[in-house]
Amino acid sequence: MFLLRLLYRSFTRQLRRRSLIALTVALCASICVAMLGIVLDVGDKLNAELTTYGSNIVVQPKADAVVSNLYETDRDAAPTAHLDESAIPKIKTIFWAYNIVDFAATLKGSVKVSSSGGEVDDLSVTGTWFNKDLSLPTGETTTAGVTTMRSWWTMEGSWPADDADQAVVGSNLAGRLGLSEGDTVTLTTPTGSRPLTVTGVYTSGDSDDDTLYAPLAVVQELTGHIGQVDQVEVKALTTPENDLSRKAAQNPAILSSADWETWYCTAYASSIAYQIEEAIPGAVAKQV
């Protein structure tokens, strides 16, 4: 009985002061939760907005990445090494596979481009996936391609099919050659020639306006690089960078076991890039 009376008095004595303390604690907790929600929401929205403007991770052959780092060459420089196209779907088997929004393999090649309106010699064109169905090592399937990674392009017409002799042409190149939707453009290399139907003319606002995009298989055949690619663009949903992710990006080996596990199991761009390198032999993945 005495114990119950003691407890009762401890709660009822100075009730006003205790109520004020409880109210203050509750208010502080509410403010902290609200601020945390705002911070996380802003980071997620910023990341989602940035991913609408193309890839945020680029995968290259290790040899090309080394040369690029040593001599600060442009990403558009002619490739000196290649990746196996059949290994690229492994990107969707990494720990953060569900954060991979889209990806596309590409292969650049120098070709002669001609049409009824003129011709251009030694033009660098890009072969890629547009909307390609892929079989994964897990037995699942996925669709990948640049159609969702070029959302800022203005397209007059439609995207090509991956299994057809078709292409989309940049607005500047289309103007030089007098091309429009439905016209035919011919790509020629020492390996042979390939007439392609123009399905659309796009405006990108950058150097892509001076070139064209064709199905990956077409450029592989014309350049003699069957089954090979020189770059993979990856669009991934990532967690905003912090000191841990920046430290890991320099060298994951310097992390402690606890930090390494935290970094690997968080969707930082650097950890996703690291996992892509684990999945694809001979590849280097970098955040862009």
Protein language model annotation of sequence segments:
Residues 105-109, 116-131, 138-221, 225-228, ...:
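Hydrophobic secondary-structure segments that place a key small or acidic residue at a functional site
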Residues 1-34, 43, 48:
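N-terminal Sec/SRP start-transfer signal
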Residues 4, 30, 36, 137-146, ...:
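C-terminal or late-domain output modules
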Residues 36-124, 274-284:
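Hydrophobic, regular-secondary-structure patches
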Residues 190-195, 201-288:
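Mechanotransmission and gating elements of multispan inner-membrane complexes involved in transport
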Residues 69-70, 135-140, 225, 243-248:
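Short, charged, solvent-exposed linker or helix-capping segments at domain edges/interfaces
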